Amino acid sequence: YNENSRPLPISSCEPFVLRNDASLMNGALLLATPVAHSAVPLHRLARKVLGQTVGIALGGGAAFGLAHLGVLQVLERNQIPIDLVVGCSMGSMIGIAYAAGFSISDMIEKAHEMGKRSKMIMGIDFSLSAPGVLAGNRLRDLYTPLLGSKQRFEDLVKPCRTVATDIESGERVDIGKGSLEDAYRASIAVPVVISPIKIDGRVLVDGGVSDPVPAEVVRDMGADICIAVNVVPPLKKGVEMKVSQYVRQLAKINPFSFFARDQGFPNLFDITMNSMQTLQHELGNFKAISADVRVNPDLSEFTWIEYYRSEEIIAKGIEATEQMLPLIKKKVGMACEWKKTE
């Protein structure tokens, strides 16, 4: 040890010394991002310098995405550090709230509240001009106020990105700066169901069309260890058709639906969402291949619209993550657990 070195204690491991020179500053610059104004915590900087940065990819999936809350709760309880987060569709909404610094318990409480049928009805606003059944404005009005003063990526306490899809080129669009409202609104714009929006001249829809489990983006952000969560289950005969009775009742007032009655076809919402579910399950598993750990909650008994079953869905996320804990701890090196001072 000499006066030009500074020891960095790491729990019960041998003391580790980082030189007090440009190498440490370079590590800090690697961790700093143009969207993070808050100071970088020492333990996160140390993980970056030592190649142990942990990132998580939260996949899309409408109500299935509530399982992410269970995943994050287990990681938090077991002191698994998450340095950065990338979300798709419902995963983008949860990822943003997590990166904003909200506690998991508060997020779960809000999920239960928002999952009430009365709240779901409040989120319905039919579009009269935009290319989608729902305009999406009421969904925005319900969620954005929950973020409080955190309205831009620059306000977040953890690095975060969301993904959307350019419907004209098919390209994945990574969003990591500017308005959080625009970012999650683009990421949840399920084709046909929720109207797309324009950002920087690009027409954007649900990120699940191009990358439902954005593990690759987690790597691009500099994560050394990636945890990927695919919450979308394969279709199960008889379960996927239990889509909300609200939709079926609304179809009865559509004059054009008269000609399609009694022909044995699912309604428009069933066809669209079942198609998206099949796509996101298969493509999501493929996109998650590069992750170090893959968490797949068993949500085969649920449907995409059952937000009112939030408690059960979150429990499935907890169960799946607990099963993967030994591997997660091994990958993040919990033998040398970081003592958090954040």
Label for each model-derived stretch:
Residues 144-147, 185-196, 207-213:
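Active-site glycine-rich loop that binds ribose-phosphate moieties when present
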Residues 146-158:
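A short alpha-helix-loop-beta-strand transition element characteristic
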Residues 59, 68, 81-100, 211:
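Catalytic nucleophile loop
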Residues 2-44, 54, 104-146, 165-179, ...:
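Non-catalytic peripheral regions of patatin-like phospholipases
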Residues 57-58, 204-206:
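Short hydrophobic beta-strand that contains or immediately precedes a catalytic carboxylate
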Residues 70-79, 100-106, 178-181:
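A glycine- and small-aliphatic-rich helix-loop capping segment at beta-alpha/alpha-beta transitions
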Residues 37-85, 126:
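Helix-rich "cap/lid" substructures immediately adjacent to catalytic or cofactor-binding pockets
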